[in-house]
């Protein structure tokens, strides 16, 4: 079974600010979870549902393990992103 994908959701990032630091500098992307439980595998991104609006700096910090309590931090960003995505009709 393949992971769930949504071009509408992933492309919505270009219209959003970073949910972690608030940056609205053109570097915000839909940053996918790095958790296997969210569908992440070798060379496979997690389901699009498990992502967050993150700028380049915050995305890099997450990917490189530079945030404390990595899963808890990501889930906090995910929750904020899901509220935005639902309110704006991206989901």
Residue ranges of model-derived segments:
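Short cysteine-rich loop/turn motifs with clustered Cys
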Residues: 4-31
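Short recognition patches in nucleic-acid-associated and regulatory proteins
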Residues: 26-42
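The −1 position to Zn-ligating cysteines in a subset of zinc-ribbon hairpins
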Residues: 17, 51-54
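Short, intrinsically disordered, charge-biased short linear motifs at domain edges
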Residues: 2-11, 39-46
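A generic structural signal for well-ordered alpha-helical surface patches
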Residues: 31, 53-56
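Polybasic, low-complexity binding patches
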Residues: 39-49, 60-91
